[in-house]
Amino acid sequence: MKPLLKENSLIQVKHILKAHQNVKDVVIHTPLQRNDRLSERYECNIYLKREDLQVVRSFKLRGAYHKMKQLSSEQTENGVVCASAGNHAQGVAFSCKHLGIHGKIFMPSTTPRQKVSQVELFGKGFIDIILTGDTFDDVYKSAAECCEAESRTFIHPFDDPDVMAGQGTLAVEILNDIDTEPHFLFASVGGGGLLSGVGTYLKNVSPDTKVIAVEPAGAASYFESNKAGHVVTLDKIDKFVDGAAVKKIGEETFRTLETVVDDILLVPEGKVCTSILELYNECAVVAEPAGALSVAALDLYKDQIKGKNVVCVVSGGNNDIGRMQEMKERSLIFEGLQHYFIVNFPQRAGALREFLDEVLGPNDDITRFEYTKKNNKSNGPALVGIELQNKADYGPLIERMNKKPFHYVEVNKDEDLFHLLI
């Protein structure tokens, strides 16, 4: 991709600078930190823009607050509406309370109680939360109907020039804080609001900086739209990287990204999980899946960034501790260390012992075993999870299984079966 190095008509540097004046006394000027571990690993200078330390633990406050700050007195009196199950809802709720504007926040009925409570906390006394529908489309429809019926203003999570300009204030801070020339900037793309603002500012103030968009491989709405030359809607997505998993990128954000993005990278969800765990264990950074996307993409650019100055936007840190086990599981599977099998065991004494003694390697560990004895049958299936110490142990494990009279199916290699059982 070759971006057009000029301002587009939708969002310009002057809009971002105005937004910076509007939000600077409300949002936290988050730190830009050189990360020694990552810098050593990739033989370059890696800087993390820590939006996980923002007051609502994500960049979303910037765009929501700036948008609401632009409202007329009539719009302020009528109130606002948003549809979100995550960080945008928190940003709108905080802005409602700070600006004294009443807001109605529509969230899916399936939203975890913890997220609902966080939104309530940020907007206490100034918001009503309406839980409705099972999907974002249901929620969006209800929010739109409320806007029309009550003459409220809809605060879009990304496809709005004021929101995009607000998110771009993050780039103002980056260039003010960095003590050298940034050669690369990596940031996540979901709806596209963040990188539309950040990319616009960088391409006009630091035009030699390469702007790299990063998407989850299971929700590549921008990548597919870029390939098609127009916005497309994905049939299905993997919702794991929830802060960046959208079926359709914004129309306005797509137009803007096409003028500022140098490359688009797709990162498998399992790799994202590995990066989340490494950031936590090695750097004491609590990143949500979308927040870890930028760091997770570095392996794909390790040759290009060697010896360079690289900024990674850690876009948020609203991570549910209850998801950590799933993240560890996805990471192990991606790294080739966790494997699942359906093994058809002979229903005779000693069959399991034979499997343990003659199939498992000395460093292999059974992490899951589900077996129900079948009466009047000579064999019975069991779901077996095996964690390897080294990826290279997989081949010998399969060789040993093939030598024994155990018929088996590798669950990892059957996506439908995997999602059904695991």
Curated annotation (Swiss-Prot):
Q: What cofactors are annotated for this protein?
A: pyridoxal 5'-phosphate
Which PROSITE patterns does UniProt cross-reference here? ACT_LIKE (PS51672), DEHYDRATASE_SER_THR (PS00165)
Pfam families in alphabetical order:
PALP (PF00291), Thr_dehydrat_C (PF00585)
Q: Which residues form the ACT-like domain?
A: 339-413
Q: Which Gene3D superfamilies does this UniProt record tie to the protein?
A: 3.40.50.1100
Top-level EC class, please?
A: lyase
Q: EC no.? A: 4.3.1.19
What the entry lists under NCBIfam families is as follows: PRK08639.1, THD1
Family under the similarity heading: Belongs to the serine/threonine dehydratase family.
Q: What is this protein called?
A: L-threonine dehydratase biosynthetic IlvA
